[in-house]
UniProtKB/Swiss-Prot annotation:
It is found in: Cytoplasm. PROSITE patterns: AA_TRNA_LIGASE_I. The lineage of its organism: Bacteria, Bacillati, Bacillota, Clostridia, Eubacteriales. This is Isoleucine--tRNA ligase. It comes from Clostridium acetobutylicum (strain ATCC 824 / DSM 792 / JCM 1419 / IAM 19013 / LMG 5710 / NBRC 13948 / NRRL B-527 / VKM B-1787 / 2291 / W). IleRS has two distinct active sites: one for aminoacylation and one for editing. The misactivated valine is translocated from the active site to the editing site, which sterically excludes the correctly activated isoleucine. The single editing site contains two valyl binding pockets, one specific for each substrate (Val-AMP or Val-tRNA(Ile)). GO terms for cellular component: cytoplasm. The keyword Zinc applies. A motif ('HIGH' region) lies at residues 48-58. The gene is ileS. Monomer.
Length: 1035
C-alpha cells in the first residue's frame, strides 16, 4: 500500500528520485501556473552574473529567496518567479580581457570594439549550466526558461525609457567633477560601487615642509596620505578657528596646529601662538615646478574639512585629485594642475617619474623630497582606501566629464521611502543603508567602457542635446536606422539624429551606463514596461519581498530604491531580508588564497539540498554570519532530517504490517492523552509557523518545526511504541496510527517550503499512494488550516513540564553515573503536582518507582553561594573578601531560597549596605550523600540513588532485554519474527532471567529461553556481570 522505505538509499538518492518525479509530472511548471485567480504576491529575483561559477554565498541567497514564494503559493497567492541574468559591465569585460590576453582600453580598441563586444555577448552564459544545475539540485524554483536578460534589446529599451524619464525631470546632467576613477579600467565609478571596494592598507605618509615665501628658514608643515598628489599642489588649507603655533625644531621654524605638536621629533621651542585666521593668505614657494599655474596659487586658505584627528592641522590642496580639494579650488578660484593621464601614470612633464603609475611613484617622490630637504619625515599609516570593486586596482580621485543623476535633489524622498521599507534586521534602515541614503551624492552613471547599455543621449556641435527613450523614438529621429537595430556599441554609435536646432547630424555620447542601473531597473525592464505588460507591472510593483546579501546595501538595494524613487516616487520593494556572509567552519572568510572555500556542488552531492537548506535556516538569524562546512551540514542532517525520516519510516513499517489504511478511519477521533497532546502541538505549530512566515521570521519558524520533530520523535513516538506492537487492531492502536498519519501528512505540508525534497517523498508515500484524487505534489497543496478547537494550551504546558522534569531526571542520573535502565526507588520534584497521568509517564521514563511533587528539596541538597565577581566586583571590588565571608556565615539554604524566589537580601559590610540578589550571587546545589540533584529555573528534582537488591535485579532484567533487542536488530530479523534465546555462563543472571522469564518472552517475541551454551553466543557485560547470549529465528 505504502511505498516501502528503501534503507539503502541516501538522502541524496531520494532527492534525485524527487527531481525525476518533478520533471515527469511537470510539477514546477504547475506550481508557476497555480492560483491564476489568486491575489498577486510579488517577488523580485536579483540577477547574478552568469559568467562566473556559483559559490556557497549563492546557496544561502537561493534558499532564503525560495522559501517565502513557496509558502505564499501554498497560501493561495499568484507568485510570478522570473529568473534574471546580469550580463553587462566590468565583470564581463575583465573576463574577456583575460581570455584574449589583453589589458586596458588601448589594447581593446586595437583588438576592435565590435569583436570585443561580440566576445562579451557570447561569454555571458559561460557558466549558466552550472547555475541551473545548482538551482535545480537546491530546489530553487524560479522560471529559468523565460528569464530577463539585461543585454536584450527589450530590456535596454526599458532602461532607456527610465533614463528619458530622468531627463525630462532634469535629473540627468553632464558635469566636470572629481570622480572615483579606476585607471586600470579607464572609467569612473559610482559612490555605491566605491563603497563595495574599501580595503585597509598600510601606506607611507609624508610630513612636508612648504617654505614660506620671503622667509629664510620658516616652513609650513603639512601632512598627506597621497604623496603622488604633491606635484599638483596649489594651496594649503587650515581651519581658521584652531590654535596654531610657530616652533623652532632642529634649527628650523615650523608652523603647525598646537594640538598636534606631538608629531614633532626631538625637542622644540614654541615661538608664538595664534589663531589659524592669522595664516590666511600667507604665501609659500612652489614645491615641484613641473607646471606653471595660470591663476594665483601657493597660499594658505580656510577649509572646514580640516581636522585635528591626524597630521598637522594643515592639509595640502590639489584640486585635480579630491572632492574636498576641488570644491575648495572652485571657492578660491585656484588653478587645476593635472599631471596624471587616464592610465593613472604621470605625464611627460613630470620628468623624474613620467610613465610611472602614481601609487608606485610614492616611494620615489618621498626619496626625492628627502634629498632636497622638503620632507620632514615619513611614517606608515593604516587607513581605508577605495579599490576597484572588480579589478582591485587602487582608485584615484580624478577630474572627468561624466553624466550624473541628480540624487541629491531626491535625498529627502529617498530617506522617506527607506523609512517605509521593512528591513530584516531593522537596524539596516537607520544604520548601514540609512546612513548611505542620508549622505547620498549624485550618481555618476556613465562609464567609459564598451559592453553595457549605451547612454541614449545624442549631442550636436551647436550644443543641443537630446535623450531617446525608445526604439520607436530612435527611428523617428534617427537617420537610416536599421530595422533590427542592435542597441550596443559600436552599432548604436553609427546612428545619427538630425538636430532640430541647426539641422546638423547629432552624435551619440560615447559612454555606456553603470551596470548597476541595469539591475536596479529590473522591476519594470524584466516586463519590457511600459511598452508591454502594463497590467502585470501594476500588479507586481512594488515587490512585497526581496532578499540578497548585505553587500547589496551598496548595490542592488540602493539602485532599486534610487531608480524607483526618481521615476515612481516610491520604493520598488516593501520587505527585505538582508543576508549575512557565509564563513568557513572556523568563522573565517572563505578565500581561494586560504584554501578554505567550500564547493557548493560537493555539499549538494554529498549531503543534499534539504540538509543544506535546513542548516542555513536554523544555524543563525539570516542576517548574521553563518559558519558553513560539509561537517556542519552533515550534523544538521543527522540531528533533524534523520530524526524526521525515522519517524516516517517507523509509521510505514508498522502500518504495512497491519495493512492499516487511514481512509477507513477518516472520522476517527482518539481520546488518548498523548494523541490529543501531539495534535494540539501540531495545530499550534501550524499556527505559529504561518505567523512567523507572514512576518518573515524564517529562523523562528524553522526552529519551531525542529522542536516539534524532536517532540514527535523523542517523546510521542518513543512513549507510544508499545501501542503499535499489540497484536490486535484495537481502538487505541487505531488512534495511534491515525494520529501519527495525520501529523506526518500535515507536517509534510508545513515543512514543505523549507525541505521540499523530503516532504515530497513523505507526501508521495503517505498520500498519493492511497488517494487517487490527491494533489500530485505536496507543493501544489494548500497551506494547512489550524483548528483552534484542537489546541489545548494547558495540556501542552503540562506535557512541557513533564518533559522538562524527565530531562532533569536524566541529567541527575548522568551526574550520579547511573544508567536509565537501572531502576531507582524515588524522585522528588519541587514543582506543584501534575495529574496522575504525567506521574506515570515520568516514572516510566526515568525508571523510578515513586514520584513526589511539591517536595521540599532542602533536606536532600547542599547549597553553596558565592559572589558573582563580574557583577559585584564592579561596585565593591575591595570588599569582595569580606562579602564572601559574610555570605558564608549565613544559612545557605535559607539565603538560596530567598534569592531564588526573587527577594533582595541586604547585608552590611564595613558600614556599606549591599543588596544581594539573583544577579550578583551564584547559587549552586548538589545532592547530599545518597541523592542526586538537577535543576533549571524554578524546577528542581532529587533522585534517591540507593540501589537495593530488588532494584538491582530489575536493572539486570532491563539490560538483558536491551541486549536481546539489539541482537534481533543486528541479525536483520523482521519486527514480527519469533525467536529462541540461549543464555549461559552466569548463575546469578540466569536466576534473574528465570524470575522474569514471562516478561522477557513477551517483550522480545521469544518462544523459548534455553539455559545452555551455544558456540555462536556473544559475551555481554550486564552491569559488571558477564553473560553469554545467543538468539536465533524460530522457524
Amino acid at each position: 500500500m505504502y511505498k516501502k522505505v528503501d534503507s539503502s538509499k541516501s538522502f541524496v538518492d531520494i532527492e534525485r528520485d524527487v527531481l525525476k518525479l518533478w520533471h515527469e509530472k511537470e510539477i514546477v511548471k504547475k506550481s508557476f501556473n497555480s492560483n491564476q485567480d489568486g491575489e498577486y504576491f510579488s517577488f523580485y529575483d536579483g540577477p547574478p552574473t552568469a559568467n562566473g561559477r556559483p559559490h556557497v554565498g549563492h546557496i544561502i541567497t537561493r534558499v532564503m529567496k525560495d522559501l517565502i514564494p513557496r509558502y505564499k503559493v501554498m497560501k493561495g497567492y499568484k507568485v510570478p518567479r522570473k529568473a534574471g541574468w546580469d550580463t553587462h559591465g566590468l565583470p564581463v569585460e575583465l573576463e574577456i580581457e583575460k581570455k584574449l590576453g589583453i589589458s586596458g582600453k588601448p589594447q581593446i580598441e586595437e583588438y576592435g570594439i565590435e569583436k570585443f563586444v561580440k566576445e562579451c555577448k557570447e561569454s555571458v552564459f559561460s557558466y549558466v549550466s552550472l547555475w541551473k544545475d545548482m538551482s535545480e539540485k537546491l530546489g530553487y524554483w524560479v522560471d529559468m526558461e523565460n528569464p530577463y536578460v539585461t543585454y536584450h534589446n527589450d530590456y535596454i529599451e526599458s532602461v532607456w525609457w527610465a533614463l528619458k524619464q530622468m531627463w525630462d525631470k532634469d535629473l540627468l546632467y553632464k558635469g566636470h567633477k572629481i570622480v572615483p576613477y579606476c585607471p586600470r579600467c579607464g572609467t569612473a565609478l559610482s559612490s555605491h560601487e566605491v563603497a563595495q571596494g574599501y580595503k585597509d592598507v598600510k601606506e607611507a605618509t609624508a610630513f612636508v615642509k612648504f617654505k614660506v615665501k620671503g622667509e629664510e628658514n620658516k616652513y609650513i608643515l603639512a601632512w598627506t596620505t597621497t604623496p603622488w598628489t604633491l606635484p599638483s599642489n596649489v594651496a594649503l588649507a587650515i581651519n581658521k578657528a584652531y590654535d596654531y603655533v610657530e616652533v623652532i625644531n632642529n634649527g628650523e621654524h615650523l608652523i603647525l596646529a598646537k594640538a598636534l605638536l606631538t608629531v614633532l621629533e626631538g625637542e622644540y621651542e614654541v615661538v608664538s601662538e595664534f589663531k589659524g585666521e592669522k595664516l590666511l593668505g600667507m604665501e609659500y614657494e612652489q614645491l615641484f615646478k613641473f607646471a606653471n599655474p595660470d591663476k594665483k596659487a601657493f597660499y594658505v586658505v580656510h577649509g572646514d574639512f580640516v581636522t585635528l584627528s591626524d597630521g598637522t592641522g594643515i592639509v595640502h590642496i590639489a584640486p585635480a585629485y579630491g572632492e574636498d580639494d576641488n570644491m575648495l579650488g572652485k571657492k578660491y578660484d585656484l588653478p587645476l594642475i593635472n599631471l596624471v593621464n587616464g592610465e593613472g601614470k604621470f605625464v611627460d612633464e613630470v620628468e623624474p617619474w613620467k610613465g610611472l603609475f602614481v601609487k608606485k611613484a610614492d616611494p620615489k617622490i618621498l626619496e626625492y623630497m628627502k634629498e632636497n630637504g622638503t620632507l620632514y619625515k615619513s611614517e606608515k599609516f593604516t587607513h581605508s582606501y577605495p579599490h576597484c570593486w572588480r579589478c582591485d586596482t587602487p582608485l584615484l580621485y580624478y577630474p572627468r566629464d561624466s553624466w550624473f543623476v541628480r540624487m541629491t535633489s531626491l535625498r529627502d524622498k529617498l530617506v522617506e521611502n527607506n523609512n517605509k521599507i521593512h528591513w530584516y534586521p531593522d537596524n539596516i534602515r537607520t544604520g548601514r543603508f540609512g546612513k548611505f541614503v542620508e549622505n547620498v551624492i549624485d550618481w555618476g552613471i556613465s562609464r567609459d567602457r564598451y559592453w553595457g547599455t549605451p547612454l541614449p543621449i545624442w549631442q550636436c556641435e551647436c550644443g543641443h542635446r537630446d535623450c531617446v527613450g525608445s526604439i520607436e523614438e530612435l527611428k523617428e529621429k534617427g537617420i537610416n536606422v536599421p530595422e533590427n537595430i542592435e542597441l550596443h556599441k559600436p552599432y548604436i554609435d553609427e546612428v545619427k539624429l538630425t538636430c532640430p536646432k541647426c539641422g546638423k547630424p547629432m552624435t551619440r555620447t560615447e559612454e555606456v551606463i553603470d551596470c548597476w542601473f541595469d539591475s536596479g531597473s529590473m522591476p519594470f525592464a524584466q516586463l519590457h514596461y511600459p511598452f508591454e505588460n502594463k497590467e502585470v507591472f501594476e500588479n507586481t510593483f512594488p515587490a512585497q519581498f526581496i532578499s540578497e546579501a548585505v553587500d547589496q546595501t551598496r548595490g542592488w538595494f540602493y539602485t532599486l530604491l534610487a531608480i524607483s524613487t526618481s521615476i515612481f516616487d516610491k520604493s520598488s520593494f516593501e520587505n527585505c531580508i538582508v543576508l549575512g556572509h557565509v564563513l568557513d567552519k572556523h568563522g573565517l572568510k572563505m578565500s581561494k588564497h586560504k584554501g578554505n572555500v567550500v564547493d557548493p556542488f560537493d555539499v549538494l552531492d554529498n549531503q543534499g539540498a534539504d540538509a543544506c537548506r535546513w542548516h542555513f535556516y536554523t544555524s543563525s538569524a539570516p542576517w548574521l554570519p553563518t559558519r558553513f562546512s560539509q561537517e556542519d551540514v552533515a550534523e544538521t542532517q543527522r540531528k533533524f532530517l534523520s530524526t524526521l525520516w525515522n519517524v516516517y519510516s517507523f509509521y510505514v513499517l508498522y502500518a504495512e504490517i497491519d495493512k492499516f489504511n487511514p481512509n477507513d478511519y477518516k472520522d476517527f477521533v482518539s481520546g488518548n492523552v498523548m494523541d490529543k497532546w501531539i495534535v494540539s502541538r501540531l495545530n499550534t505549530l501550524t499556527k505559529d509557523v504561518g505567523n512567523y512566515l507572514d512576518s518573515y521570521g524564517i529562523t523562528q519558524a524553522a526552529l519551531e518545526i525542529q522542536d516539534f520533530v524532536d517532540d514527535l520523535s523523542n517523546w510521542y513516538v518513543r512513549r507510544n511504541r508499545s501501542r503499535y506492537w499489540t497484536q490486535e487492531l484495537t481502538d487505541d492502536k487505531v488512534g495511534a496510527y491515525v494520529t501519527l498519519y495525520r501529523v506526518l501528512v500535515t507536517l509534510s505540508k508545513v515543512a514543505a517550503p523549507f525541505i521540499p525534497f523530503m516532504t515530497e517523498q513523505i507526501y508521495q508515500s503517505l498520500v498519493t499512494s492511497i488517494n487517487e484524487g490527491a494533489e500530485e505534489s505536496v507543493h501544489l497543496c494548500k497551506w494547512p488550516e489550524y483548528d483552534e478547537s484542537l489546541i489545548d494550551s494547558s495540556l501542552e504546558e503540562e506535557m512541557k513540564l513533564a518533559i522538562s522534569i524527565v530531562k532533569l531526571g536524566r541529567s541527575a542520573r548522568n551526574g550520579a553515573n547511573i544508567k536509565n535502565r537501572q531502576p531507582l526507588y524515588e524522585m522528588r520534584v519541587s514543582t506543584k503536582a501534575l495529574p496522575d497521568y504525567y506521574g506515570d509517564i515520568i516514572r516510566d521514563e526515568l525508571n523510578v518507582k515513586k514520584v513526589e511533587f511539591g517536595a521540599d528539596l532542602s533536606k536532600y541538597v547542599n547549597f553553596e553561594i558565592k559572589p558573582n565577581l563580574p557583577v559585584l566586583g564592579k561596585s565593591y571590588g575591595k570588599l569582595i573578601p569580606k562579602i564572601r565571608k559574610e555570605i558564608s556565615s549565613m544559612d545557605q539554604m535559607k539565603l538560596a531560597e530567598r534569592v531564588r524566589s526573587g527577594e533582595a537580601v541586604k547585608i552590611d559590610v564595613d558600614g556599606t549596605e549591599i543588596e544581594l540578589n539573583s544577579e550578583n550571587l551564584l547559587v549552586t546545589m548538589q545532592g547530599l550523600e545518597g541523592f542526586a540533584f538537577a535543576g533549571i529555573g524554578e524546577i528542581g528534582i532529587v533522585l534517591e540513588t540507593t540501589i537495593t537488591d530488588e532494584l538491582r535485579e530489575e536493572g539486570y532484567l532491563r539490560e538483558v532485554l536491551s541486549k536481546v533487542q539489539n541482537m534481533r536488530k543486528e541479525s536483520g530479523f523482521e519486527v514480527a519474527d519469533k525467536i529462541e534465546i540461549y543464555v549461559s555462563g552466569n548463575e546469578k543472571l540466569e536466576n534473574v532471567i528465570r524470575k522474569f522469564e514471562d516478561t522477557i518472552k513477551k517483550e522480545t517475541l521469544a518462544t523459548d529461553i534455553i539455559y545452555s551454551e551455544n558456540k555462536e553466543a556473544a559475551i555481554y557485560n550486564i552491569n559488571g556481570e558477564e553473560l553469554n547470549v545467543f538468539v536465533k529465528k524460530n522457524c
